[in-house]
Amino acid sequence: METICLAPCKKNAARLAAHLVFIDESGFLLIPSVQKTWSPVGQTPILHHRYRHDRISAISGIAVSPKRFHCMLYCQLYEDNIQGEEVAVFLRHLLRQISGHLIVLLDNGKTHRSDSIVELLSRTSRLHLEPFPPYAPELNPDEGVWNHLKKTLANGRPDTKNELMDVLSDEICRIAASQNLLRGCIKQSDLPSFFP
């Protein structure tokens, strides 16, 4: 694999004393994702569920503070697909929650280049967007949050979107409360280490 140079982002973050924020989106279905399980010998495990394709879409960001390297998780859940307007709403939420400059690293998806985001960037001098290289999800630490959530929720079977929303909210709060888990998501990515 060729080496990926994200050094300019790190240098700009240090120069601006900016928070680094890694953003990604994901979706969760009412149909459970089946993982490995166990059962007594000769008894096949059966997972009962309602066969509905309802889903919850989520956008989150792992923010790393510039001085103490403290990690924070920000997340918003939606009942519909995430479009450019929802990404802009999330970015405005980050700007309200985090003081100082933000360098936001995200994939180069179409929703991240929408008119509402271009307008937000033109009005906000402390927000800087940097795309990850194409086809490189392994560089985004926020993928670790989604992987952890999907493993935690595997074999579960919420009956309604509200139940799924409640379960997701509880698990996201648990992840957000764990510095070790958030740092682990960053360390498991293929990014060069920047923790002291």
Cite the ranges covered by each PLM segment.
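Short, solvent-exposed loop/turn segments at secondary-structure junctions
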Residues: S26-L29, A63-K67, G109-H112, Y135-P137, ...
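RNase H-like DDE/DDD metal-dependent nuclease/strand-transfer catalytic core used by mobile genetic elements
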Residues: G84-E130
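RNase H-like two-metal-ion nuclease catalytic core shared by retroviral integrases
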Residues: D107-N108, D115, E130-A154
